[in-house]
């Protein structure tokens, strides 16, 4: 008898709880579920924007390094960044086309990256090299997170495949940065 009474209390509590939840969720407060394609496109659009702006910054800041740096290690790294990130941008556009996702591709830096570029333009000598290498390290760490996040959680296979390849590239750049940062800064 005690078990039946206990079961009755549990069932009653469950009904009250579910009834309370049902009352709390009227039709006006429950958002309509968005389509899977829309959710994927939003995520893909954000990924494409972050990756494209990152590539543009790497190329533009590295072109500046070729003009302003006198350090051969910094200049060699900058040349490598221009080549790799130009290739990355091209491959991203190909993946985006294959993915058939309508995601706008930025054509200019955002405000944050333009400010960083302005800081570099105002720098000279050893300060330029330090700023450039620090910005490269910071930018590549952010890029790595972006690539890994999309590779693991993105909703489009073509873009995930690109993110996998880009992850390897960014990891290589971070490794190179670790090596040349020490040498470049110690030799000044």
What is each residue range found by the language model?
Residues 2-11, 18-188:
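His/Met- and acidic-residue-enriched segments that coordinate or traffic transition-metal cofactors
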